Amino acid sequence: MYKRSDKVAEAIHELVSGLLVKGLKDPRIGFVTITGVKVSDDIRHATIYYTVMGSDEAKKSTLHGLNSSVGFIRKEVSKELRLRFAPELIFKYDESIEYGNRIDQLLKEIGSEEGGND
């Protein structure tokens, strides 16, 4: 059974992903992927998780670009979802993909070491 906040999170995910592709013209926002959205039960706060291809500098630049676009994105969310109150949007870099890649790399190293010891 879905809660209303889950449905709103899904809708925000789709809307923000679409805005990043065609709605925002900020050059600081590079190749960004929205990986998830968590919305509080009262729908007052939404945390948007994203990843960026590129260096640490690109990640910082993208965060600055996203934070400067929060007002526009929030207005679009409110307008498209017809919410009485637009949720406060917080962008957070999603480190889970990098973490997963690091674990995978370590497991491969362990596997190759064990294979070499036979």
Swiss-Prot record:
Subunit structure, as described in the record: Monomer. Binds 30S ribosomal subunits, but not 50S ribosomal subunits or 70S ribosomes.
Keywords carried by this UniProt record: Cytoplasm, Ribosome biogenesis
Subcellular location: Cytoplasm
Protein name: Ribosome-binding factor A
MF (Gene Ontology): ribosomal small subunit binding
Organism: Geobacter metallireducens (strain ATCC 53774 / DSM 7210 / GS-15)
Disulfide bonds: none
Pfam families, alphabetized: RBFA
UniProt KW Cytoplasm keyword: yes
Primary gene name: rbfA
Family assignment from sequence similarity: Belongs to the RbfA family.
